[in-house]
Design a protein with these regions (language model features):
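Active-site acidic/histidine proton-transfer and metal-coordination neighborhood
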Residues: 79-178
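Acidic (Asp/Glu)-rich catalytic clusters
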Residues: 1-2, 30-35, 48-67, 84-99, ...
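Acidic-and-aromatic substrate-binding clefts and catalytic sites of carbohydrate-active enzymes
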Residues: 40-53, 72-84, 156-162, 183-192
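Hydrophobic faces of well-ordered beta-strands that scaffold small-molecule active sites
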Residues: 3-9, 41-43, 65-70, 101-103, ...
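Active-site mouth loops of central-metabolism enzymes
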Residues: 11-25, 44, 72-83, 121-129
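Short, glycine/charged-enriched secondary-structure capping and boundary segments
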Residues: 20-22, 55-58, 115-118, 164-167, ...
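Non-cleavable N-terminal signal-anchor transmembrane helices
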Residues: 1-42
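N-terminal small/glycine-rich loop or linker at the start of catalytic domains
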Residues: 1-18, 66-72, 109-119
């Protein structure tokens, strides 16, 4: 049985704290991932977002784009504005033949605010989650209909983080969670060979 495995560049550098591991180049990251047996890599801050430039670099290491973070603002924003915000990444991921965009809601998040304790993260009522769930479901449907589905990434310091928040999110939305979507992509790429 063969499976394709992908990894995120956060194993080599941190997009939120640029000063961490700034000495690791994109090519070194891809080389090490390839040697370790990974065939997919999420995008990160060192990735050119143009397949004409990125494609040959990925091909050199036998790596493909398997996803990548999008900092969503739909909780407090307008769906049409969010479509405009994601359009460039949407087009790039289609060109890269990526399985999905990783959508993380960053509106109201305390992530990156070093003086803010994690306990001060925003919390939504069930009624607010229901409104957000309908909004993100409509947005996810639009993304999928236009050729690039999203997977939802719950995240520390964000409005959807805890198990209880995930339960409410799943109750009020149709958006697949990141681990479920990636597992589905992984299982669909498994092939059996006789040996």
């Amino acid at each position: 049985m063969k499976a394709k495995l992908g990894i995120a560049p956060i194993a080599w550098w941190n997009d939120d704290l640029a000063e961490l591991s700034d000495d690791v180049s994109l090519e070194e990251c891809l080389r090490q991932a390839s040697v370790a047996g990974f065939t997919g890599m999420e995008t990160g801050r060192r990735f050119p977002m143009d397949m004409a430039e990125l494609g040959p670099i990925l091909a050199k290491y036998g790596i493909s784009v398997c996803g990548g973070w999008f900092s969503g603002l739909l909780l407090d924003g307008d769906i049409e504005v969010e479509k405009d915000r994601i359009a460039q990444q949407h087009a790039f991921f289609k060109a890269a033949k990526a399985p999905c965009i990783v959508y993380g809601e960053t509106a109201r998040s305390v992530q990156g605010i070093k003086s803010a304790p994690l306990a001060t993260k925003p919390k939504l009522t069930e009624a607010e989650v229901a409104v957000y769930g309908r909004k993100i479901s409509d947005f996810a449907d639009w993304c999928a209909k236009n050729g690039m589905p999203i997977s939802y990434h719950h995240h520390m310091a964000a409005v959807i983080e805890t198990e209880a928040e995930l339960d409410l999110f799943m109750k009020h939305s149709t958006v697949p969670l990141l681990f479920r979507k990636l597992l589905s992509c992984l299982l669909s790429s498994i092939s059996f060979s006789e040996k």
